[in-house]
């Protein structure tokens, strides 16, 4: 169910040289990790872009095609701290691309009001860790506007973008993964892309989505993830997972920056143990693609789910619960969750904390011999 | 030499007027504070040799601390987020001299110098930045998570510390300690809603809290002019009295601090001090600091308003010490910071189990990937 008429095929796979130069942040090799990106056909010519450039390109297209689209947030006027909005003010003017004061609650509330008037606000919260002052506006106002007015009002055109996740040395307030807080809130959609191509297509779909979307961007990959991104307009539908790699023995589920770590673990498991892994990129956290996951688990009978956020109450818990409801008699082993520890995100201990490829490899191994 | 490096033009510091008397007392005039709902302190003070040398030494220590941090960051020994105080030293030094060590301070993330002024050692500050076991927070927090006696951090979320300051002040009132709390924030944080919630509570309950807006003109990369309606932060409390102070003159800061502390101790409730100051460096280490302002602007402030050069000039004009003697002080400071950073670099990393400690009061099991691999206290 594709809304972008430029896409013929989304699920076809093509291995591209999408790689990271900081691959050893979790103890792995520093050599580039090839990550299979998807192929977008008929979206025009391609250009080498990293993740922030792909997001910039996506916003550029959104603003060009939708004269009501506006971009705002802290320091976005001169390009934003991660350069995602660079050049947009020059192109679309200071009345459509502007800096806000440092007031996250105000930014979110302002964006909701603007959306209720039919504009297309694309608000930036500078770090996902700073989204909590805006939590009330997002959870109580944005998520419930349509419901509590019986459909008279909504802020469906709202998109809030925010960089999330480990970055190497971010410490307590620049590293968190808050997707579960928002996934727990009916009325919101939560999206996390894993590659530049994905980021552009998912962002365009999120901006045009008629329900409020929280779009978390893996900041570790802003510069390190580079691939040939189509420069045309295309969308990747929300709520659809991507099977990155087909396999028969075990299902591995992740999203965002974790996909690269999981691919590394999967490659290790295949090379060292001959295990055939099916790797799924969830893409949308809420509503998540239950059917794709269930279908895969029914085939493999074994599951590992991995995210950076703490284990308890993380989104892997929701996925696990659903899998046991839907696939109980198909399961050959307990579902494994490879996640962050139940501690604040640490500074010095980041390497211990993150669910790296070795922890995932161990988990795959254990699950296979259960 | 720092003075050569800065190319300080003594004529540019012409607004400082001092008069030495035979008793060794030196009268110093400064720009009178703008006032709101209060009379404010006078525009002059009397100082002496000891105080001048002490301010010179303290502020040189503050600046040197940050210079060493900058160097360690560039060597990639300090990682992550790091915000330097360079240029704003007079605010910290002046306020600390206006209160006692029993009073309380809470600030935002530009906190290294407050640690030093509160009495922490340079070594524990560097060690925290270097994520070492001997750091003030056991190396667990880093730059923006520093704490010591009567200093409540070191807070990374913009504006979040201000309501905490009101709570700390309430405890002083309730327990009749006679102490005050300084709640510091920047011009960027001045637009956070929770600051106004704190103003209201503090005023309603007449809490002994001094809200201090360190207005360094830029909230990250956004000029105050582009982020803030009305440019007077000291009047923004509406029903809260305020002063706008020359935050580059340590004596102006000290007198305003004393006035505010007396105001609070007399039971008048909160007061706001807006410190007209400036940071020479970028917002954080990744900000070169010249994309949203000109190099000329930064240099102009350095040459005309530098708080340390300001004091140096008073000392030299009044023949309290020679240039060589001041250079010797700077050398001692340099040596102190150098030794402290070397010790911090040599200190061990925290034990791995520290990942799991201090999550709750009691150490609790922390789930790992598999139950058997979980942490058990």
From Swiss-Prot, chain A:
GO molecular function, a single term: metal ion binding
InterPro entries: THDP-binding, Transketo_C/PFOR_II, Transketolase-like_Pyr-bd, Transketolase_C
Enzyme Commission number(s) from the entry: 1.2.4.4
Location of the transit peptide in the chain: 1-25
Reactions catalysed: N(6)-[(R)-lipoyl]-L-lysyl-[protein] + 3-methyl-2-oxobutanoate + H(+) = N(6)-[(R)-S(8)-2-methylpropanoyldihydrolipoyl]-L-lysyl-[protein] + CO2
Binding, thiamine diphosphate: 130
Entry-linked SUPFAM superfamilies: Thiamin diphosphate-binding fold (THDP-binding), TK C-terminal domain-like
One record GO biological process: branched-chain amino acid catabolic process
Metal-binding as UniProt keyword: yes
GO cellular component: branched-chain alpha-ketoacid dehydrogenase complex; mitochondrial matrix
Pfam family, one: Transketolase_C
Ligand binding (K(+)): 156, 158-159, 209
Enzyme class at the top of the EC tree: oxidoreductase
Keywords, ordered alphabetically: Metal-binding, Mitochondrion, Oxidoreductase, Potassium, Transit peptide
Subcellular location: Mitochondrion matrix
Alphabetized PANTHER family for the sequence: 2-OXOISOVALERATE DEHYDROGENASE SUBUNIT BETA, MITOCHONDRIAL, 2-OXOISOVALERATE DEHYDROGENASE SUBUNIT BETA-RELATED
UniProt subunit comment: Heterotetramer of 2 alpha and 2 beta chains.
UniProt-recorded name of the protein: 2-oxoisovalerate dehydrogenase subunit beta, mitochondrial
Species, as recorded: Dictyostelium discoideum (Social amoeba)
Lineage: Eukaryota, Amoebozoa, Evosea, Eumycetozoa, Dictyostelia
Swiss-Prot record, chain B:
NCBIfam families reported for this sequence: PDH_E1_alph_y
Catalytic activity: N(6)-[(R)-lipoyl]-L-lysyl-[protein] + pyruvate + H(+) = N(6)-[(R)-S(8)-acetyldihydrolipoyl]-L-lysyl-[protein] + CO2
GO biological process: pyruvate decarboxylation to acetyl-CoA
Residue range covered by the transit peptide: 1-26
The name this protein goes by in its record: Pyruvate dehydrogenase E1 component subunit alpha, mitochondrial
Localization per record: Mitochondrion matrix
Record keywords: Magnesium, Metal-binding, Mitochondrion, Oxidoreductase, Pyruvate, Thiamine pyrophosphate, Transit peptide
Cofactor(s), by name: thiamine diphosphate; Mg(2+)
Gene Ontology CC, one term: pyruvate dehydrogenase complex
Signal peptide positions (record): none
């Amino acid at each position: 169910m594709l809304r972008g008429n430029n896409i013929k095929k989304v699920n076809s796979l093509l291995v591209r040289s999408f790689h990271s130069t900081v691959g050893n942040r979790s103890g792995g090799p520093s050599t580039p990790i090839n990550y299979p990106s998807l192929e977008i056909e008929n979206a025009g010519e391609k250009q080498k872009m990293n993740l922030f450039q792909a997001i910039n390109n996506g916003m550029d297209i959104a603003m060009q095609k939708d004269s009501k689209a506006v971009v705002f947030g802290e320091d976005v006027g001169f390009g934003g701290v991660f350069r995602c909005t660079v050049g947009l003010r020059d192109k679309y003017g200071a009345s459509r691309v502007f800096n806000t004061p440092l007031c996250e609650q105000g930014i979110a509330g302002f964006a909701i009001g603007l959306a209720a008037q039919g504009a297309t606000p694309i608000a930036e919260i500078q770090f996902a860790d700073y989204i909590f002052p805006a939590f009330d506006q997002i959870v109580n106002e944005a998520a419930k506007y349509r419901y509590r007015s019986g459909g008279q009002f909504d802020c469906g055109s709202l998109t809030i973008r925010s960089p999330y996740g480990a970055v190497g040395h971010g410490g307590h307030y620049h590293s968190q993964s808050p997707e579960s807080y928002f996934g727990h809130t009916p009325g919101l959609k939560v999206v996390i892309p894993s590659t530049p191509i994905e980021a552009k297509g998912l962002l365009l779909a999120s901006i045009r989505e008629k329900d409020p979307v929280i779009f978390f961007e893996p900041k570790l990959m802003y510069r390190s993830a580079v691939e040939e991104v189509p420069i045309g307009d295309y969308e990747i539908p929300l709520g659809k997972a991507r099977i990155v790699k087909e396999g028969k023995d075990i299902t591995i589920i992740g999203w965002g920056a974790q996909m690269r770590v999981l691919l590394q673990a999967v490659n290790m498991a295949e090379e060292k143990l001959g295990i055939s892994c099916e790797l799924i990129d969830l893409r949308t956290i809420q509503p998540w693609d239950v059917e794709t996951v269930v279908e895969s688990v029914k085939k493999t009978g074994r599951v590992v789910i991995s995210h950076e956020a703490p284990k308890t109450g993380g989104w892997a818990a929701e996925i696990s619960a659903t899998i046991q409801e839907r696939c109980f008699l198909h399961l050959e082993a307990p579902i494994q969750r490879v996640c962050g520890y139940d501690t604040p995100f640490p500074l010095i201990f980041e390497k211990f904390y993150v669910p790296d490829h070795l922890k995932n490899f161990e988990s795959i191994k254990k699950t296979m011999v259960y | 030499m720092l003075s050569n490096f800065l190319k300080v033009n003594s004529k540019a510091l012409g607004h400082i007027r001092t008069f030495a008397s035979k008793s060794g007392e030196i009268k110093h005039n400064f720009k009178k504070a703008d006032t709101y709902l209060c009379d404010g302190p006078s525009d002059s003070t009397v100082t002496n040799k000891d105080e001048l040398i002490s301010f010179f030494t303290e502020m040189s220590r503050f600046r040197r601390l940050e210079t060493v941090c900058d160097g360690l960051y560039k060597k990639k020994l300090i990682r992550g987020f790091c915000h330097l105080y360079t240029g704003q030293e007079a605010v910290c030094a002046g306020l600390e001299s206006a209160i006692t060590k029993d009073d309380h301070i809470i600030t935002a993330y530009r906190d290294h110098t407050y640690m030093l002024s509160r009495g922490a050692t340079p070594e524990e500050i560097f060690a925290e930045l270097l994520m070492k076991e001997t750091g003030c927070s056991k190396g667990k927090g880093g730059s923006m998570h520093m704490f010591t006696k009567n200093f409540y951090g070191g807070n990374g979320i913009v504006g979040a510390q201000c309501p905490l300051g009101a709570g700390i002040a309430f405890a002083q009132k309730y327990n009749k300690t006679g102490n005050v709390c300084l709640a510091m924030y920047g011009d960027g944080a001045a637009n956070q809603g929770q600051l106004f919630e704190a103003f209201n509570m503090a005023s309603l309950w007449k809490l002994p809290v001094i809200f201090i807006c360190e207005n360094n003109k830029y909230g990250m990369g956004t000029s105050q002019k582009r982020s803030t309606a009305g440019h007077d932060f000291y009047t923004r409390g509406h029903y809260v009295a305020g002063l706008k102070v020359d935050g580059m003159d340590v004596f102006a800061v000290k007198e305003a601090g004393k006035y505010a502390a007396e105001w609070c101790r007399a039971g008048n409730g909160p007061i706001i001090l807006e410190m007209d100051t400036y940071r020479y460096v970028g917002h954080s280490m990744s900000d070169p600091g010249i994309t949203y302002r000109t190099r000329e602007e930064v240099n102009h402030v350095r040459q005309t308003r530098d708080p340390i050069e300001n004091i140096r000039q008073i000392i030299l004009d009044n023949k309290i010490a020679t240039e060589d003697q001041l250079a010797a002080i700077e050398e001692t400071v340099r040596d102190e910071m150098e030794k402290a950073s070397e010790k911090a670099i040599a200190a061990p990393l925290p034990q791995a189990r520290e990942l799991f400690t201090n999550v709750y009061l009691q150490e609790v099991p922390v789930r790992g990937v598999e139950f058997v691999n979980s942490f058990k206290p």
